[in-house]
């Protein structure tokens, strides 16, 4: 499940859920639901996260194991 990668990327970059939520302009609880897989994350937010983490949307959603 790709939400595990959201968590791992956030932790690897020493960021909090609040920092990511602020970056995405959503509230922390909404982002936490994305990260736990409770709520589906919009494609526009996946793109922003891929840009933030300097990776691809394909990596985040599990279509590749190549981080870059």
Regions picked out by a protein language model, each given a short descriptive name:
Residues 5, 16, 42-45, 56:
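Residues that mark the N-terminal boundary/hinge immediately upstream of a DNA-recognition element
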Residues 25-40:
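Recognition helix of helix-turn-helix/homeodomain-like DNA-binding domains
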Residues 6, 20-21, 31-34, 60:
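Conserved hydrophobic/aromatic packing and binding residues within compact polymer-binding modules
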Residues 38-48, 67:
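Short, basic-rich loop-to-helix N-cap that marks the start of a DNA-contacting helix
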Residues 25, 44-59:
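DNA major-groove recognition helix of helix-turn-helix/homeodomain DNA-binding modules
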């Amino acid at each position: 499940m790709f939400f595990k990668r959201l968590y791992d990327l956030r932790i690897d970059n020493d960021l909090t859920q609040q920092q990511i939520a602020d970056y995405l302009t959503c509230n922390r609880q909404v982002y936490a639901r994305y990260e736990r897989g409770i709520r589906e994350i919009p494609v526009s937010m996946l793109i922003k996260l891929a840009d933030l983490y300097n990776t691809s949307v394909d990596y985040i959603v599990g279509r590749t194991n190549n981080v870059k």
